[in-house]
């Protein structure tokens, strides 16, 4: 397992980290029980994974993760969780919601602190008000030792060009230790501005869902390629994978981890076999010719899925 640094914090994170969101929601949607989750986490740690990402919005995943990590020394892994300011009728303006959220997260995760406390799904049009209201309380939580670092995550479905994350880094580079965005074969837009900005502000980049959902579902890939004028549809990337779906996913992870600006690539699965395959993929680099062709053909891509 390779490790990269979280900005200027000095903390090191595994190149592949584990996410409890995604389609399976840490096995909540696939019938995995607590013993299965513990086995998954144990295997991840055995293979060198040291960052586990969760959120208050991921069903019961925080409590499940807390139980799965029990018995592992707290200083051997990192936990990132998220709090959402968004509400059905807009956004909350009560700073106490962030305090209540982290207190509940700490209880469920059975820990005294999290390593990264993130604002979940920041929309660029909300950022000015959001930062004015919530940055002071988040900094207070950091000073109190309830979180080591502060981060923000994007709302990819409405912001595939990462304006929100770029705005966060531009406005408050001294506040945010990390941003979470998507960079992959089907969404390379971050390379134009967000990734260079992360370098200049020494901000860690957590790469979420780099192969989901397009590379894992031929019908989605066909739909997206048809939109982009690729007549080959779902076979447009057969040159990369020899038509093998598992190989395409591995290539997708390799592409996602290639930029040095990327700190870690988050993988969410309820399958130990899939986890092992994703980690194994990152033990190899994508061939230079493949990398250059993907950047040449899809460098302007900004797919929300």
Where are these regions (language model features)?
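Active-site groove signature of glycoside hydrolases
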Residues: 106-125, 129
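Active-site mouth loops of central-metabolism enzymes
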Residues: 22-35, 83-99, 121-128, 157-161, ...
């Amino acid at each position: 397992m390779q490790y990269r640094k979280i900005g200027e914090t000095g903390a090191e994170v595994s190149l592949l980290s584990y996410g409890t969101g995604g389609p399976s929601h840490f096995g909540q949607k696939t019938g995995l029980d607590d013993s299965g989750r513990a086995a998954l986490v144990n295997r991840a740690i055995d293979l060198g994974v040291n960052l586990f990402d969760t959120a208050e919005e991921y069903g019961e995943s925080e409590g499940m993760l807390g139980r799965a990590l029990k018995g592992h020394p707290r200083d051997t892994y990192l936990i990132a969780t998220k709090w959402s300011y968004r509400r059905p009728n807009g956004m909350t303006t009560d700073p106490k919601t962030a305090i209540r959220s982290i207190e509940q997260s700490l209880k469920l995760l059975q820990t005294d602190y999290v390593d990264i406390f993130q604002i979940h799904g920041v929309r660029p049009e909300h950022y000015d008000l959001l930062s004015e209201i919530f940055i002071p309380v988040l900094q207070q939580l950091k000073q109190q030792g309830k979180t080591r670092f502060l981060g923000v995550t994007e709302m990819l479905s409405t912001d595939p060009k990462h304006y929100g994350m770029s705005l966060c880094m531009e406005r408050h580079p001294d506040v945010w230790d990390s941003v979470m965005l998507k960079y992959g074969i089907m969404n390379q837009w971050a390379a134009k501005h967000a990734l260079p900005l992360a370098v200049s502000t020494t901000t860690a980049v957590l790469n979420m869902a780099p192969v989901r959902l397009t590379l894992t579902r031929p019908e989605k890939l066909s739909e997206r390629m048809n939109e982009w004028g690729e007549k080959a549809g779902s076979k447009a990337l057969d040159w990369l994978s020899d038509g093998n779906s598992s190989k395409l996913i591995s290539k997708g992870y390799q592409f996602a981890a290639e930029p040095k600006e990327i700190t870690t690539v988050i993988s969410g699965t309820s399958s130990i076999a899939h986890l092992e395959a994703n980690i194994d993929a990152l033990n190899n680099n994508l061939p230079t010719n493949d990398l250059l062709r993907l950047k040449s053909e899809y460098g302007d891509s900004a797919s929300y899925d």
